[in-house]
From Swiss-Prot:
Sites where the protein binds ATP: T12, T13, S14, T268, G312, Q316, G413
The gene coding this protein: glpK
UniProt record similarity statement: Belongs to the FGGY kinase family.
CDD domains, alphabetized: ASKHA_NBD_FGGY_GK
Species of provenance: Beutenbergia cavernae (strain ATCC BAA-8 / DSM 12333 / CCUG 43141 / JCM 11478 / NBRC 16432 / NCIMB 13614 / HKI 0122)
Protein name: Glycerol kinase
Binding site for sn-glycerol 3-phosphate: T12, R82, E83, Y134, D246
Length: 505
């Protein structure tokens, strides 16, 4: 029997391939960043062909570093940035436009027109999501409306849509030569086009958006064999057997299998998911109802999700745009030069505000500035913004679910930052727990694939493999915590109502 499972993690800033052994331990990794394309304010794009090239490269890197042959890989799992929309020609295999990324806000007018008098809640009862620029459906409509010949080609049946999971899978399984056009329930649940009850495309909503259903991939479970890597591929013949959107994959990798268990992933943005079991919980507090996972023929499991647009990308912005730091980890040392935020609060509403506000008219603000404030204070305010936004989402989860969390499992790149993790525990008032394998997104996809082919026996193996690495316990006085949180909420209100007729994006 093969000894390893390989996960492809097609993320917002990079693509990675990670090889895991049976204990869930990382054996080798390959990683390559792709270009972030900003054609206009509020627009964010990726080149799908660059992504596909990078995926092949990182698979080769991982196999080489592990000295592992394809014959020793039991299965391949795919996890991906969700919502990001790719539209391509089924005959040529070429994208008709760049991928429109989940952070992109160009579809605001489309969203407002679709909502009409019913507003953002128009489809929420059916799809679990508010009408927002975040989701795939309006992005597909924008491409069909704005790329010459795209709508006609789509109506002829010549175009295919997918998030990057589908794009990678289609290419891996042969592309124009019989590529499998499939997505899983978790990714489909982020398009605004899938009915949460039936787990099938909703033709009425697709028609409202002018999207031919023929473009849409077949919806399958998160753990089953979808196809095999093409003959000329580095993993020729290896089954591709797991697909989970990145945040659902992290939830799976964190072994959040019981109702009320939650995790928070700290990446480009932050995403907190709470398992709600086989019952959908409709949010009254600005959260999303989404599919958490579906293992083969087992019933689907749902989740509440709080999505935060900008957290880690704020640190990248300080590095790349303002040149305040030269590498992202330097933010911690800069923050340690001061004891607090000096009264400064940084609300990074670069793409509007996601949960729990859903304010597309908001834009970033740095408030509370005096001549006392230094770069150290701004660095600390940037880190604290991540913790404050997560606290607001956790409050909403408590209100919707009636569950009081006793601890929060965390993962993602920013959990290496000790200053942030301690402040997160302080502001939440609960323990924050980091697992030994922090790459839970890739791990979750690996588990889904491995379970499908019998490499792992099921959720119990995931639970048995999970191990705690570090725990942060709240240390802040409650009065201080409440004062800081009140000031944060005041700062958030200063970002509202910025985008109007005088401001395009």
């Amino acid at each position: 029997m093969a000894d390893y499972v390989l996960a492809i993690d097609q993320g917002t800033t990079s693509s990675r391939a990670i090889i895991f052994d049976h204990s869930g331990t990382i054996v080798a990794t390959g990683q390559k960043e792709h270009e972030q394309i900003f054609p206009r304010a509020g627009w964010v794009e990726h080149d799908p062909e660059e992504i596909w090239t990078n995926v092949r490269d990182v698979v080769g890197q991982a196999l080489g570093r592990a000295s592992v042959r394809a014959s020793n890989i039991a299965a391949i799992g795919i996890t991906n940035q969700r919502e990001t929309a790719v539209v391509w020609d089924r005959t040529t295999g070429k994208p008709v436009y760049n991928a429109i990324v989940w952070q992109d806000t160009r579809t605001q007018r489309i969203v407002e027109e679709l909502g009409g008098s019913e507003g953002a809640e128009k489809y929420k009862a059916r799809v679990g999501l508010p009408l927002a620029t975040y989701f795939s459906g309006p992005k597909i409509k924008w491409i069909l409306d704005n790329v010459d010949g795209a709508r006609e080609a789509a109506e002829r049946g010549d175009l295919l849509f997918g998030n990057t999971d589908t794009w990678v899978l289609w290419n891996m399984t042969g592309g124009v030569n019989g590529g499998v056009h499939v997505t899983d329930v978790t990714n489909a649940s982020r398009t605004m086009l899938m009915d949460l009850d039936t787990l099938s495309w909703n033709p009425d909503i697709a028609a409202d958006m002018g999207i031919p259903v023929s473009m849409l991939p077949e919806i399958r479970s998160s753990s089953e064999v979808y196809g095999k890597d093409r003959e000329e591929g580095l993993l020729a013949g290896v089954p591709i057997a797991g697909i989970l959107g990145d945040q659902q994959a992290a939830t799976f990798g964190q072994a959040c299998f019981e109702i009320g268990m939650a995790k928070n992933t700290y990446g480009t943005g932050n995403f907190m998911l709470m398992n709600t079991g086989t019952e959908q919980v409709a949010s009254e507090n600005g959260l999303l109802t989404t599919v958490c996972y579906k293992i083969g023929d087992q019933p689907q499991v749902y989740a509440l999700e709080g999505s935060i647009a900008v957290t880690g990308s704020l640190v990248q912005w300080l590095r790349d745009n303002l040149k305040v730091i030269s590498t992202a980890p330097e933010i911690e040392n800069l923050a340690l030069t001061v004891e607090d935020n000096g009264g400064a609060y940084f609300v990074p509403a670069f793409s509007g505000l996601f949960a729990p506000y859903w304010r597309a008219d908001a834009r970033g603000a740095l408030v509370g500035l005096t001549r006392y404030v230094s770069l150290g204070h701004i660095a600390r305010a940037a880190l604290e913004a991540t913790a404050f936004q997560s606290a607001e989402v956790l409050d909403a989860m408590k209100a919707d679910s009636g569950v009081d969390l006793t601890e929060l499992k965390v993962d993602g790149g920013m959990v290496a930052n000790e200053v942030l993790m301690q402040f997160q525990a302080d502001i939440l008032g609960v323990d924050v727990v980091r697992p030994k394998v922090a790459e839970t997104t890739a791990l979750g996809a690996a588990y889904a694939a491995g379970i499908a082919v019998g490499f792992w026996n099921g959720e119990q193996d995931v639970i048995d493999n999970w191990a705690e690495d570090k725990r942060w316990t709240p240390q802040m006085d409650r009065g201080d915590r409440d004062r800081l949180y009140r000031n944060w909420k005041k700062a958030v209100t200063k970002t509202f109502d910025w985008v109007d007729d005088d401001v395009e994006n």
